[in-house]
Swiss-Prot record:
GO biological process, one term: nitrogen fixation
Cysteine pairings via disulfide bonds: none
Family, per entry: Belongs to the ETF beta-subunit/FixA family.
UniProt keywords, alphabetically: Electron transport, Nitrogen fixation, Transport
Gene from which this protein is expressed: fixA
Subunit structure: FixA and FixB form a heterodimer.
Name of the protein in its database record: Protein FixA
Record has Methyltransferase as a keyword: no
Amino acid sequence: MHIVVCIKQVPDSAQIRV
């Protein structure tokens, strides 16, 4: 579940980067 990590890291750039 790296998607959640991306949202926490860059919620502005990668809201839900799959």
